[in-house]
A protein has these predicted regions:
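Iron-sulfur (Fe-S) cluster-binding modules
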Residues: 1-29, 37-72, 88-186, 254-259, ...
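Short amphipathic, charge-patterned alpha-helical segments
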Residues: 50-51, 244-248, 394-404
Length: 404
């Protein structure tokens, strides 16, 4: 199916929502790298096997036969407690799930709607049935990670069902390229890769270059030891980052983009490839996107494990097939980046913020974080601390609050 207009996108969203509403129960199995390493794939397979035969079990228990969906999601955040599972519509959060627990989950929760209480997270010896009951989760503000752990990480339909690509459509049909840049500039969004350079200023510098060929590049080479924020976004909601890149390309007049992913992220590469293929099949990437006349082609480039390739000029050199070596600046990438052309280079988290800003507006973004740096920041917590995992908190949150 090709989506060739804003109306088509709205119709597709309604269709997918209707299909999802038809499920009486959805089992969300965390399938981020951490949970997969803990055995989540076997749990997914066992739940799928048991739910295939659920009709016989339900009849035996004299219960109505539920319509069940088994879903692979991205990271659900509580990485030290994996494998993790959420059950909709009850919003139960299970931790330390094992294959031997699956039958009980099906019989009690999937069929009867009852909790398996021993699988709940416990805080100060009190059970926390729902994510909203867990202090580690309920104190977060999620923009970048809002879909991670909630939608199928391998389904573009589920991304569309939660408003996916609506921001892109709004940018194309309701805003000029300069209007997009102005909104990003007004939002105060800063690059989330470390330097904190204003994203709108960078886009504006590329847009005003006389050279007509321009590129949009995403830095997914997350090389800091123990960091897995960008990897979790690429694994859990690759579509949001892709949508942000398309909006950036529209704003600066680019028709080609590259995602540079570190070699140690094979699952990210796999899901990004799936996401790109699905978007192309729907007409949401490629030529004449949404019937707008706008073209944007997206490519994946795998790094070779060199830490230095996280630096912008080294990264672009690596994409070009050269040795990844930083160069003296100026010129900067906004002037002469990939193949000597003006290039927007932001990281995964920066692009993932863009769709929400376009939809909700710069003023909304300013209500979160600090005056000088609005919005949120994702962090991966590792080491000898109380909670390890993935979080997203407003800018200005103290390290003491995050760690302890």
């Amino acid at each position: 199916m090709s989506i060739t207009s804003m109306e088509d996108l709205k119709n597709k969203q309604a269709e997918v929502k209707k299909n999802l509403d038809g499920y009486t129960c959805r089992v969300l199995v965390c399938s981020g790298t951490g949970c997969i390493a803990s055995g989540a794939q076997k749990i997914y397979e066992e739940m799928s096997r048991l739910c295939e035969g659920i009709e016989g079990v339900a009849v035996e228990m004299q219960k109505d036969v539920p319509h069940v969906g088994i879903v692979k999601t991205g990271c659900q955040g509580l990485c030290e407690l994996g494998p993790l599972m959420r059950i909709e519509p009850y919003d139960y959060q299970y931790v330390h799930v094992q294959v031997d627990d699956c039958r009980e989950i099906v019989e009690k929760t999937v069929i009867c709607g009852l909790p398996v209480e021993r699988l709940f997270y416990r805080h100060n010896d009190e059970a926390c049935p729902h994510p909203s009951d867990i202090p580690f989760l309920n104190q977060q503000t999620r923009i970048v990670l809002e879909n991670c752990g909630k939608i199928d990480a391998e389904s573009i339909d589920e991304y569309i069902s939660v408003g996916g690509f609506s921001a892109m459509a709004k940018a194309f049909f309701e805003m000029t390229p300069q209007g997009v840049i102005d909104e990003i500039s007004k939002s105060g969004l800063r690059g989330r890769g470390g330097a904190g350079f204003p994203a709108g200023k960078k886009w504006s510098q590329v847009a005003r270059q006389p050279e007509k060929v321009r590129y949009v590049v995403c830095n997914g080479d997350e090389g800091d030891p123990g960091a897995f924020m960008d990897g979790s976004v690429m694994e859990g909601d690759p579509y949001k980052m892709i949508e942000g890149m398309v909006i950036a390309a529209y704003a600066v007049g680019a028709e080609d983009g590259y995602i540079y992913v570190r070699a140690e992220y094979p699952l990210s590469v796999q899901r990004l490839r799936m996401a790109i293929e699905q978007a192309e099949s729907y007409g949401l990437l490629g030529d004449n996107i949404l019937g707008s006349g706008i073209n944007f082609h997206l490519h994946i480039n795998r790094g070779a494990g060199a830490f230095v390739c996280g630096e912008g000029s080294a990264l672009t050199a690596s994409i070009e097939g050269n040795r990844g070596m930083p160069r003296v600046k100026p010129p900067r990438t906004v002037e002469q980046g990939l193949w000597g052309k003006p290039t927007v280079l932001n990281n995964v988290e920066t692009y993932a913020n863009v769709p929400k800003i376009i939809l909700q507006g710069a003023d909304w973004f300013h209500t979160i974080g600090t005056e000088g740096s609005p919005g949120t920041k994702t962090f991966s917590l590792t080491g000898s601390i109380e909670n390890t995992g993935l979080i997203e908190v407003p800018m200005g949150t103290s390290l003491r609050h995050i760690i302890y």
